């Protein structure tokens, strides 16, 4: 219906151009919204307010001329001007009833569009360091990213989903060291794990698997290790330097081959766990892109060469620096350290250069909110590379805060005292986790209420939505136990019998679904769909409690069954996009 109103408004604008009311070069941006109060009609537009300056008249006067120029329509009963110049449209009941036939005809494809046809989108999300299991904070980024990708796909975009595997940085060296020390403890209990190494039980599990497979192949005595640690490094005064000294000692003692063996065992174990965890959560990827590929394929050097060519690289104190301050950053950034090794920043440059080189129309990075400081530096180096920063959309997600009772649960990957995503999923279920993670705006703090997520009541939004779907399924199961039938074509012929306020509300809400999908996709806002489904479920439950469906009146029964079948389809379609199941029984 919105498209039909937009067409009518465009025709009215063309008529006003012909009459000289508007100049030929005026290009209107027509925005049509559903009204919140039925007394103000079904749809409204602020078109007259946006064009009044170009027309040289008041918004109200222009609104009058637009209304006069509107072509007649059999689906609009009344048009009125409200306030300073809003135009309200009242539509016929028949225009809403046609939505039922559209839904039942399209089925699982209802709401999908070709809005983004021909446009390719690259999405990167989660990309947690493979140094430990995913925790509940990562889960929100996973659920959000997967939902945004689903919504963009439903809107016609071709979406490439990618996980960036940080397999080449300092943290990975610390991970390998942590596993090695736990491995050594299996032979020599006196050795202590450095304070800032990874402490979790999963490290012990990897070490035990290493010991079972390789025996004492990687064993070295405490004395040989201590001999490699410079005496001037104090583990208490500078724990990070002490940790780095241990990593260096490990590499020296093991040699390249054995170190790589320990390193790879740790990486493979944790990365496989992450992959399995996400897959069980319904979050899948088209590609797992390793950071090591950037070096292997010369992408870091390519990025460095391009920045140098554009005059943004200089040398200082033996290191190579990016002149970031010239492009809006607060300080210049090191690209290549004086020891010749690239920084994380250099890897970011190379990875984004790789993304842009693939020719995507949009590139979406989903980061934790603690990465907000990365935004100006990323946009800066994109300018330095000669790439269009406007193609990049950086979406920030606040970490979820888990509460067990009134106690906030702390999370620290190195310390090992964190609640994993898998533990959360096992406690509240995938469906509740997926829904709760996305029912708020991503940049809002989320206090994850475990007790609410597990409750079976109308206070639990995901349960209430799923229960609406299950209730509809129960109506059709009950139908099979009676002598009554469901004649869908006959129901279509009698949709005009759906005249109660409950039915009118449901019909109007069903008609909004395609618009909700488009808005949620274009604004990267799955919470809009979550809120829509809550509204639809609430309206259905009210209808279910007020009316009966398996009645004697054949015409009304078939019309009502068609209506609730359409509600069932929309709930299932919407939940699928959110990664939530639509159970038939509860």
From Swiss-Prot:
The primary location reported for this protein is: cytoplasm
Which SUPFAM superfamilies did the record assign?
Anticodon-binding domain of a subclass of class I aminoacyl-tRNA synthetases, Arginyl-tRNA synthetase (ArgRS), N-terminal 'additional' domain, Nucleotidylyl transferase
Any one annotated GO CC term: cytoplasm
Which keywords does this Swiss-Prot/TrEMBL entry list? Aminoacyl-tRNA synthetase, ATP-binding, Cytoplasm, Ligase, Nucleotide-binding, Protein biosynthesis
From the Swiss-Prot or TrEMBL record, what is one GO molecular function term?
Answer: arginine-tRNA ligase activity
EC annotation from Swiss-Prot or TrEMBL: 6.1.1.19
Is the Hydrolase keyword given for this protein? no
What is the residue range of the motif 'HIGH' region? 128-138
**GO terms of biological process kind:** arginyl-tRNA aminoacylation
**SMART domains reported for this sequence:** Arg_tRNA_synt_N, DALR_1
Keyword set includes Nuclease: no
Q: Which InterPro entries match?
A: aa-tRNA-synth_I_CS (IPR001412), Arg-tRNA-ligase (IPR001278), Arg-tRNA-synth_N (IPR005148), Arg-tRNA-synth_N_sf (IPR036695), ArgRS_core (IPR035684), DALR_anticod-bd (IPR008909), Rossmann-like_a/b/a_fold (IPR014729), tRNAsynth_Ia_anticodon-bd (IPR009080)
- Catalytic reactions of this protein: tRNA(Arg) + L-arginine + ATP = L-arginyl-tRNA(Arg) + AMP + diphosphate
Query: Broadest EC class?
Result: ligase
Q: Where in the cell is it found?
A: Cytoplasm
> Which family, according to the similarity comment?
Belongs to the class-I aminoacyl-tRNA synthetase family.
Q: How does it assemble?
A: Monomer.
Q: Which NCBIfam families match?
A: argS
Name of the protein this chain belongs to: Arginine--tRNA ligase
Species annotation: Coxiella burnetii (strain RSA 331 / Henzerling II)
